[in-house]
Regions:
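Mg2+-dependent phosphoryl-transfer enzymes with acidic/Ser/Thr/Gly-rich catalytic loops
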Residues: 3, 174, 181-264
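Asp-based phosphoryl-transfer active-site loop
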Residues: 4-22, 211
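The start of beta-strands in P-loop NTPase/AAA+ ATPase cores
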Residues: 6-8, 68, 198
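Short, flexible loop segments at the rims of nucleotide/cofactor-binding pockets, characterized by
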Residues: 19-23, 48-49, 176-177
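Active-site phosphate-binding/coordination module
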Residues: 25-124
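Anion (oxyanion) recognition and catalysis
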Residues: 37-38, 156, 234
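A generic structural motif
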Residues: 38-42, 160-161, 216
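Conserved acidic, metal-coordinating active-site core of Asp-based
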Residues: 113-199, 205-213
């Protein structure tokens, strides 16, 4: 299917970056994204990393190209800084997001306390604090995290706006309205790119919100993606690649750009 890709939204770790592979980056994938940028497409990295951790990753893995925008911490929207520095908030989304989270954590103390008590009593997971506030969890295994998220799903029925973002053994507490998909939707609104011209690729739980078809009409995932991600991509009539990591992203981009170049 020949489609016009104007905005590319990619996860970072596990999608573009294959930590245990050599090379870590797929050269053909990076070259294609760079070529699309030269042709006028915009590329954003949509990640659970903070701005600082993403910048260190771009440096550590020697990315030869730069994203046009970054969506960080599974919620915030940044553009290149116009007044020194590398990045600045794009619009007032980040402020609105911070306010919503402050109000949520103030009103959801009983839910959060119950979750932390469950974690401390019944698991070996570690609670991560940002100052005095609990920000998230690190489990000892994915099976342990499965058990924790099952409990969270039970208790959050009392306060549905209390939610979480999960990636392997890591979990971040968050407002249900703010996630990778919502951040992508805000960016697309700000730069006036419709859903029909957005390609998105990811591999794990926290990527589902940008791969379920609501915010990107061209969702995709590499072969190393977990089954719930593959299911979401298939349900959205997207593309599940046969190759892993960046090679899979490259394969998916070619699928949408050139039709079925790589036969499934």
């Amino acid at each position: 299917m020949d489609q016009n890709v104007r905005l590319i939204s990619t996860d970072f770790d596990g999608t573009l970056v294959a930590h245990d592979n050599d090379p870590v980056l797929d050269p053909a994938c990076i070259e294609l994204i760079g070529q699309l940028q030269q042709d006028g497409a915009l590329w954003t990295i949509n990640t659970g990393r903070s701005v600082e951790l993403l910048e260190s990753g771009l440096l550590d893995f020697e990315f030869p190209i730069r994203p046009d925008f970054i969506l960080t911490s599974e919620r915030d929207v940044f553009r290149p800084s116009r007044n020194g520095g590398k990045w600045e908030p794009f619009g007032n989304w980040n402020d609105r997001c911070a306010q919503a989270h402050a109000e949520l954590f103030n009103s959801a103390q009983s839910v959060l306390t119950e979750i932390i008590d469950f974690v401390n009593r019944t698991t070996k997971a570690r609670v991560i604090y940002l100052g005095p506030a609990a920000e998230g969890l690190v489990a000892t295994s994915e099976e342990e995290m499965d058990r924790i998220t099952e409990f969270i799903e039970q208790v959050r029925t009392r306060q549905p706006e209390f939610n979480y973002q999960r990636n392997t053994i890591y979990l971040r507490f968050c407002h249900a309205d703010y996630h990778k998909g919502a951040a992508l939707a805000e960016l697309s609104r700000l730069i006036n790119v419709p859903r029909e011209e957005i390609f998105a690729a990811g591999d794990h739980h926290n990527d589902v919100s940008m791969l379920d078809g609501r915010f990107a009409a061209m969702p995709a995932c590499p072969a190393n993606a977990i089954d719930p991600v593959k299911d979401a991509v298939r349900s959205a009539r997207g593309y599940v690649a046969e190759r892993e990591f960046g090679a899979g992203v490259h394969e998916a981009l070619l699928h949408f750009l050139n039709g079925n170049v790589l036969k499934r």
